[in-house]
C-alpha cells in the first residue's frame, strides 16, 4: 500500500494519522481472485494545513463506505451486521486478511463507548474465542469482557441512553462559528469601550500594555491547558465541567461544575444590567425616564432577558446567527474607533483632550500617573475580568462538529485577536487623548502666555486647573472617550450593546449546557430532573428556564457590585483547575494521557494554576476566600457521597504511581521489629461466604496491616479459570461496598493445598508480603473426607515451612453461610421472575391473561416470594430478615457477631508459649478498635506454683516495657497436672474411631493394618505424646474455669511436629482444646520478634 502526501485542501479532520482504507468487498472471489487488476484508489484528503493528518483511499465501487466517511469522519463500517456475536461463523472475521482467521483488524468500533452517538460499539473476538479449541455454535454474550475489565464503560445515565439516534437535523458548529466567534464576543466586553481608556490613563501605555499582556498570559496558559485536555480523547458536552471532571475526577469536577454553572447564570444578569444601564443613560440624556434609574434598569433588564431566553430556546442555530450579527456590529464599532483617530479633531474635541496622534501625548502618557487609592494591582483587578470568556466555545463542546480541533484553534486564535485589539485600542487612545481636559474651548493658549510644558500646552490648550480641581474630560475622567474619538458616536453605543448582549447570550447558553452535563453524571442526587434534553440537539430546556429564573432574580435585586467579584473568582477557580488538570495528568504519567495538541508544558500549566489563584486574591481577597470555602464544601460533599463513576481520571493514575513508588521505596527499607504489622492471608473462599472470619481479621488489620481474602478453585484448570475470572471483580466490589479494607485474590489448582502453597509464596508485593495465615477451624473434620483433612493440616505445616505465622479462628456455629446465600439466590430468582411477569402483564392488554397470572401471584404470596429479597452484596445482618426456615437462624446471627460493638468484657490471652509476641500483639490491636475498646486484656501464663508472685511481677514488668495495658495477670501453676477422668474419657471417645490398636495384634497383622490405614492413630504415637494430650485436655478445663465468660479467647496454638503426630490426633487436640468455649483465636507466630521495648 502506497503512502502519499495530500495535495488538495478542504476542512481538516481531528485525526492525526494517515490512513488507507481498503474495502475487500463482501464476496470472497473479489478478495482472492488471481487475475484481479491492481487496485485503484479514489483519494480523499483533509487539509494541507495539518500535515501528517488524515488521508483515506477507497476502492471504487463502494459509494456507501465513501458516503459514510464523509458524513461521520470515520473509516470503519458501521453496519449492524457486524454485531453478530457468533464470531466463529461470522464471515467478516474470516476475511480480515483474506484468509481463514478469526483475528480482527483494528477498527474504530472496537474502541467506542457503549452509548456512542457516532456509531455502534462492536465486540472484537475475545481471547477465549481465538485461543480455545474451535467449537461450533459458540456464542459470546453481548457485553464484551474487555470493556468491563478496562473500565471504559460510561455512567449509568449514559448507558440508559444507549440508542441508535437519528442524527439528521442536528445542528453542529465548526471552529469559527462555534468557538472563535463566541470567545471573541465574550472577551470583548464593555471594558473595551468604557474602561480601557481610564486604565491606560492610570497605568500609562507601558504598564497598561503590561496589564493586558499579564492577563493574556493567564488566559493563554489556560487556553493551552484546555487545548491539551480537549485533544486527549473524544469530548462530550459539558465544557469546563467535562474537561475537569474527566481529568481530575468527580470530586473536583462536581464542585467546580456547580459553581461554574451558577457563575454563568449570574453573569447573564450582570451583562444584562450593564446593557440596561447604558440604555438608561441614553434615556436620561433624552429626558425619557420611565420611573427612576433603579426601576428602569429592572424593567429593561427583565424585558431583555426574556428576549434572550426566546432566542436560546429557539435553538442553537438561531443563537449562533444572533452571535454572528452581534460580532459584525462589534467589529464595525471597533473599526469606527480606529477611523475616528485619524479624522482631524475639531475644537470641541480638542477642548475635551482629543488631538489625534501626537508624539508628545504618547510620551506623556507612556508612564503611570496613579490617582489616590489606585495602583498597579488595583487597576489590573479592574481590567482582568475583561480578558476572561475563553471557555465560551468549550462550554458548548457537545454542539461542535469536531471539539478536538475546534476548541484549540478557536480559543487560541480568539485570545490572539482580542489581545491585539486591546493593545491597539490602548496605544491609540493614549496617543491621541490627554489625561485631563476641562472641556472648555476658552482654555486655549493665547500667544505670549506661559506654557507649563504639558502636551496639551504645546498643542495650544491650558488644562492646568485640572491639577487643583476635578475635570470632566480626558482619559482619567471621561468613560465615554472612545465614543468621542470615534468617527460616529452612536456606533460605539451599538458596540456596547453588542458586547453586553453577546456575553449575556453566551452565558445563557453555557450555564444550562454545563449544568445538564453535571446532572447527567448524577453526581449530585436530586438534580437528575435537569438532565433531560429535548429535540435533535438535546437542548436543556429545563436548564434554560432555571438560568432564566436565577438571572431574573439578580436583575430584580439590582445590586451586583457585591456579587460581581465572587463571580469573577468562580471563573478564575475553574481556570486554575483546568491548568492543574493538565499538570496533574502529565505528572501522573498515565499512558492514557496522549493529547494531540502538543504545545503545552506541565510546569507552565502548574504556573498558570498558581497564577490564577494569585489573581483571585489580587482582584478581591474576601471573594477568593468565599470561593475556596464553597469549593471545599462541595468537594467534601462529593467525596463523602462517592458517586459511582469511573472516568480514568489522573487522580486515579497518580494514586497508582504513588502506590508504585511507595512500594518500590519500601523495598529499600530493612525490616525492623518496631514496624511489624500483621499482613494476613485469610482463607475465606468467597468473602461473602465466611463474613465472621473476615470481620475478625479485618478488626486487627484495618489501617494497620495487609488483608488478602483468598479463594482456591479446585478442579480442571479450564473450568476453574473461567469461574475464577468471572467473579473476581464482583468479589472485590463486595469488599469495597462493605467497607472492608482488603484485597481479593484467587488461584486455580488441582488440589486445595497446592493452591494455598501458591498463595503463601506468591501473594503480596515487595515488603507487603503476608506473614500470617488466618484460617477457620474445620468443624466437620470428623465427617470430612480424609483428603480434605490432610490438606487442612498440611497447609498449617506449609505455613510454618515458609516461616509464616498461623491463626485458627473457631466460633461455635462455624463460618460458612453458603446455605443461607443459596436460599437468598433462589429468592432473588423468584423475585426476578415475578417482576418479569408483572412487566408482561402491563404490556399485555389481554384481560384473560391478566386474571390467570394474577391468580398465580396470589398463590405465590403464600410461599413468601412476593417480598423483595435482600441484596446479596449488602451487609450480612440484612439476611436476618429473610425467611430461612430450617437453615439455622443461629448461623446467620453468629456470622454477624464481630460486626457488632462488643460490650464491656474481657479478651483473655493465654500466652502459654513465646512465639515472638504475635499472640499478645493481635489482642492488643483489637483493643484499639472502636468495637473492642471496652474489652480489657487479661493475661494468662504458665508458671510454677511455688513462684506465682515472682512470675506475676516479672510478666507485669515485661508488659509494661511493651507498653501494653492490661487489666489483670494470672499465673497458672497447675497446667501440667492430669485432667479429670471425665474430660480424658471425652477425649478418648473422640479419637476411638480413628485408633489402630495395633498393640493388641501380632506383628504381621499390625504391620498390615499400618499399611492399609496409615492415617490412623497408632498406640505408639499416642503413648509418645500422652503428656501433650493431657495438656490439651487440661487446658480446656482451665479455659472453662477462667474464660468461659470472655468475649474472646486468644490462645497459643500447639505445634504438631512433622512425622510425629498424625493429622487426626492433631485435629483431636484442637477440638478438645477449644470445645464449648466463646470465640477462640489459636495463634502461633513465626518465632521472630514482633514486640520490642527498645526505642
Curated annotation (Swiss-Prot):
Ranges for region Disordered: 29-49
Reported tissue expression: Predominantly expressed in kidney (at protein level).
Modified residues (Phosphothreonine): 91, 96, 101, 114
GO molecular function, one term: sodium:potassium:chloride symporter activity
Residues bearing attached sugar chains per UniProt: 442, 452
Residue spans crossing the bilayer: 174-194, 198-218, 256-276, 299-319, 324-344, 376-396, 414-434, 547-567, 568-588, 606-626
Modification after translation, per record: Phosphorylated at Ser-87, Thr-96 and Thr-101 by OXSR1/OSR1 and STK39/SPAK downstream of WNK kinases (WNK1, WNK2, WNK3 or WNK4), promoting its activity. Short-term cyclosporine administration increases SLC12A1 phosphorylation in kidney thick ascending limb, possibly through the inhibition of PPP3CB/calcineurin A beta phosphatase.
Modified positions (Phosphoserine) in chain numbering: 57, 87, 116, 126, 144
Residue ranges, Cytoplasmic side: 1-173, 219-255, 320-323, 397-413, 627-1095
Keyword Iron-sulfur assigned: no
Top-rank taxon, per record: Eukaryota
Extent of motif RFXV motif: 16-19
Segments on the Extracellular face: 195-197, 277-298, 345-375, 435-546, 589-605
Membrane topology: Multi-pass membrane protein
Subcellular location(s) of the protein: Apical cell membrane
Regulation: Activated following phosphorylation by OXSR1/OSR1 and STK39/SPAK downstream of WNK kinases (WNK1, WNK2, WNK3 or WNK4).
Cellular component terms (Gene Ontology): apical plasma membrane
Biological processes annotated in GO: cellular hyperosmotic salinity response; kidney development; positive regulation of calcineurin-NFAT signaling cascade; urea transmembrane transport
Cross-referenced Pfam families: AA_permease (PF00324), AA_permease_N (PF08403), SLC12 (PF03522)
Record key words, sorted: Cell membrane, Chloride, Glycoprotein, Ion transport, Membrane, Phosphoprotein, Potassium, Potassium transport, Sodium, Sodium transport, Symport, Transmembrane, Transmembrane helix, Transport
Family: Belongs to the SLC12A transporter family.
Subunit structure as annotated in this protein's UniProt entry: When phosphorylated, interacts with PPP3CB.
Domain text: The RFXV motif mediates binding with OXSR1/OSR1 and STK39/SPAK.
Job description of the protein: Renal sodium, potassium and chloride ion cotransporter that mediates the transepithelial NaCl reabsorption in the thick ascending limb and plays an essential role in the urinary concentration and volume regulation. Electrically silent transporter system.
Protein name: Solute carrier family 12 member 1
Organism: Mus musculus
Amino acid at each position: 500500500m502506497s503512502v502519499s502526501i495530500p495535495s488538495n485542501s478542504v476542512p481538516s479532520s481531528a485525526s492525526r494519522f494517515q490512513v488507507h482504507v481498503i474495502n475487500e468487498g463482501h464476496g470472497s472471489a473479489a478478495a482472492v481472485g488471481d487475475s484481479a487488476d491492481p487496485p485503484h484508489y479514489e483519494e480523499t484528503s483533509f487539509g494541507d494545513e495539518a500535515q501528517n493528518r488524515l488521508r483515506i483511499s477507497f476502492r471504487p465501487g463502494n459509494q456507501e463506505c465513501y458516503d459514510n466517511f464523509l458524513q461521520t469522519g470515520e473509516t470503519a463500517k458501521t453496519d449492524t451486521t457486524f454485531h453478530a456475536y457468533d464470531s466463529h461463523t461470522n464471515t467478516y472475521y474470516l476475511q480480515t486478511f483474506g484468509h481463514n482467521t478469526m483475528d480482527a483488524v483494528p477498527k474504530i468500533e472496537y474502541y467506542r463507548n457503549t452509548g456512542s452517538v457516532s456509531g455502534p460499539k462492536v465486540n472484537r473476538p475475545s481471547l477465549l474465542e481465538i485461543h480455545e479449541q474451535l467449537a461450533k455454535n459458540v456464542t459470546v454474550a453481548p457485553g464484551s469482557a474487555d470493556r468491563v475489565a478496562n473500565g471504559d464503560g460510561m455512567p449509568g445515565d449514559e448507558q440508559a441512553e444507549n440508542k441508535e439516534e437519528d442524527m439528521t437535523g442536528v445542528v453542529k458548529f465548526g471552529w469559527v462559528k462555534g468557538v472563535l466567534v463566541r470567545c471573541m464576543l465574550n472577551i470583548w466586553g464593555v471594558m473595551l469601550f468604557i474602561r480601557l481608556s481610564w486604565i491606560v490613563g492610570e497605568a500609562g501605555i507601558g504598564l497598561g500594555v503590561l496589564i493586558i499582556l499579564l492577563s493574556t498570559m493567564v488566559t493563554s496558559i489556560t487556553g493551552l491547558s484546555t487545548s491539551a485536555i480537549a485533544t486527549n480523547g473524544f469530548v462530550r458536552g459539558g465544557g469546563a465541567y467535562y474537561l475537569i471532571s474527566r481529568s481530575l475526577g468527580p470530586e473536583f469536577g462536581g464542585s467546580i461544575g456547580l459553581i461554574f454553572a451558577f457563575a454563568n447564570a449570574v453573569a447573564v444578569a450582570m451583562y444584562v444590567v450593564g446593557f440596561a444601564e447604558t440604555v438608561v443613560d441614553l434615556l436620561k440624556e433624552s429626558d425619557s425616564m420611565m420611573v427612576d434609574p433603579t426601576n428602569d434598569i429592572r424593567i429593561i433588564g427583565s424585558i431583555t432577558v426574556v428576549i434572550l431566553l426566546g432566542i436560546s430556546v429557539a435553538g442553537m442555530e438561531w443563537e449562533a446567527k444572533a452571535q454572528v450579527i452581534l460580532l459584525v456590529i462589534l467589529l464595525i464599532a471597533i473599526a469606527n474607533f480606529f477611523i475616528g483617530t485619524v479624522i482631524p479633531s475639531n475644537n470641541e474635541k480638542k477642548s475635551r483632550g482629543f488631538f489625534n496622534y501626537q508624539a508628545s501625548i504618547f510620551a506623556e502618557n507612556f508612564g503611570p500617573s496613579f490617582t489616590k487609592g489606585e495602583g498597579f494591582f488595583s487597576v489590573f483587578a479592574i481590567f482582568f475580568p475583561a480578558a476572561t470568556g475563553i471557555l465560551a466555545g468549550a462550554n458548548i463542546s457537545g454542539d461542535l462538529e469536531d471539539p478536538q480541533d475546534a476548541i484549540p484553534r478557536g480559543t487560541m486564535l480568539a485570545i490572539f485577536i482580542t489581545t491585539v485589539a486591546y493593545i491597539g485600542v490602548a496605544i491609540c487612545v493614549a496617543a491621541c487623548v490627554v489625561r485631563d481636559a476641562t472641556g472648555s474651548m476658552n482654555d486655549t493658549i493665547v500667544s505670549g502666555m506661559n506654557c507649563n510644558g504639558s502636551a496639551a500646552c504645546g498643542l495650544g490648550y491650558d488644562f492646568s486647573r485640572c491639577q487643583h480641581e476635578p475635570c470632566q474630560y480626558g482619559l482619567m475622567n471621561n468613560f465615554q472617550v472612545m465614543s468621542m474619538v470615534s468617527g460616529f458616536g452612536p456606533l460605539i453605543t451599538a458596540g456596547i450593546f453588542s458586547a453586553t448582549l453577546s456575553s449575556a447570550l453566551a452565558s445563557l447558553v453555557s450555564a444550562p449546557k454545563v449544568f445538564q452535563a453535571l446532572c447527567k453524571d448524577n453526581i449530585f442526587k436530586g438534580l437528575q430532573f435537569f438532565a433531560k434534553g429535548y429535540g435533535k440537539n438535546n437542548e436543556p430546556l429545563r436548564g434554560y428556564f432555571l438560568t432564566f429564573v436565577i438571572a431574573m432574580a439578580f436583575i430584580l435585586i439590582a445590586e451586583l457590585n457585591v456579587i460581581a467579584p465572587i463571580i469573577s473568582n468562580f471563573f478564575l477557580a475553574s481556570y486554575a483547575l483546568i491548568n492543574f488538570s493538565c499538570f496533574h495528568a502529565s505528572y501522573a504519567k498515565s499512558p492514557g494521557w496522549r493529547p494531540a495538541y502538543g504545545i503545552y508544558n506541565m510546569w507552565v500549566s502548574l504556573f498558570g494554576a498558581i497564577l490564577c489563584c494569585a489573581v483571585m486574591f489580587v482582584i478581591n481577597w474576601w471573594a477568593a476566600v468565599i470561593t475556596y470555602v464553597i469549593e471545599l464544601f462541595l468537594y467534601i460533599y462529593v467525596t463523602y457521597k462517592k458517586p459511582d463513576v469511573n472516568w480514568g481520571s489522573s487522580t486515579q493514575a497518580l494514586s497508582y504511581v504513588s502506590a508504585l513508588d511507595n512500594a518500590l521505596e519500601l523495598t529499600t527499607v530493612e525490616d525492623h521489629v518496631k514496624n511489624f504489622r500483621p499482613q494476613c492471608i485469610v482463607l475465606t473462599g468467597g468473602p461473602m461466604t465466611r463474613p465472621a472470619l473476615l470481620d475478625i481479621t479485618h478488626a486487627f488489620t484495618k489501617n494497620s496491616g495487609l488483608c488478602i481474602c483468598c479463594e482456591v478453585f479446585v478442579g480442571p484448570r479450564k473450568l476453574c479459570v473461567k469461574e475464577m475470572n468471572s467473579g473476581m471483580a464482583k468479589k472485590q466490589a463486595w469488599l469495597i461496598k462493605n467497607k472492608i479494607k482488603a484485597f481479593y485474590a484467587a488461584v486455580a489448582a488441582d488440589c486445595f493445598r497446592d493452591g494455598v502453597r501458591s498463595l503463601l509464596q506468591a501473594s503480596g508485593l515487595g515488603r507487603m508480603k503476608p506473614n500470617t495465615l488466618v484460617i477457620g477451624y474445620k468443624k466437620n473434620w470428623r465427617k470430612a473426607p480424609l483428603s480434605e483433612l490432610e490438606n487442612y493440616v498440611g497447609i498449617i505445616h506449609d505455613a510454618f515451612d515458609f516461616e509464616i505465622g498461623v491463626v485458627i479462628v473457631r466460633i461455635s456455629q462455624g463460618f460458612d453461610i453458603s446455605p443461607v446465600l443459596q436460599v437468598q439466590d433462589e429468592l432473588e430468582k423468584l423475585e426476578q421472575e415475578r417482576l418479569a411477569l408483572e412487566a408482561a402483564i402491563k404490556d399485555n392488554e389481554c384481560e384473560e391473561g391478566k386474571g390467570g397470572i394474577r391468580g398465580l401471584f396470589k398463590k405465590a404470596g403464600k410461599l413468601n416470594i412476593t417480598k423483595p429479597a435482600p441484596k446479596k452484596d449488602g451487609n450480612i445482618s440484612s439476611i436476618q430478615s429473610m425467611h430461612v426456615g430450617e437453615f439455622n437462624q443461629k448461623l446467620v446471627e453468629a456470622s454477624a457477631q464481630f460486626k457488632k460493638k462488643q460490650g464491656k468484657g474481657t479478651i483473655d490471652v493465654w500466652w502459654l508459649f513465646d512465639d515472638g509476641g504475635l499472640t499478645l500483639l493481635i489482642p492488643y490491636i483489637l483493643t484499639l478498635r472502636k468495637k473492642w475498646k471496652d474489652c480489657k486484656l487479661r493475661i494468662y501464663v504458665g508458671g510454677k506454683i511455688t513462684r506465682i508472685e515472682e512470675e506475676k511481677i516479672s510478666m507485669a514488668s515485661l508488659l509494661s516495657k511493651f507498653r501494653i495495658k492490661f487489666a489483670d495477670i494470672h499465673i497458672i501453676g497447675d497446667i501440667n497436672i492430669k485432667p479429670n477422668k471425665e474430660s480424658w474419657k471425652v477425649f478418648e471417645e473422640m479419637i476411638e474411631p480413628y485408633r489402630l490398636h495395633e498393640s493388641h495384634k501380632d506383628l504381621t497383622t499390625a504391620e498390615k493394618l499400618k499399611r492399609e490405614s496409615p492415617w490412623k492413630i497408632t498406640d505408639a504415637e499416642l503413648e509418645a505424646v500422652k503428656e501433650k494430650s493431657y495438656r490439651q485436655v487440661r487446658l480446656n478445663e482451665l479455659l472453662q474455669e477462667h474464660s468461659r465468660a470472655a468475649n474472646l479467647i486468644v490462645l497459643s496454638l500447639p505445634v504438631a511436629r512433622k512425622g510425629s503426630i498424625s493429622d487426626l490426633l492433631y485435629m483431636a487436640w484442637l477440638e478438645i482444646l477449644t470445645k464449648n468455649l466463646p470465640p477462640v483465636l489459636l495463634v502461633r507466630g513465626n518465632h521472630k520478634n514482633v514486640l520490642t521495648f527498645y526505642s
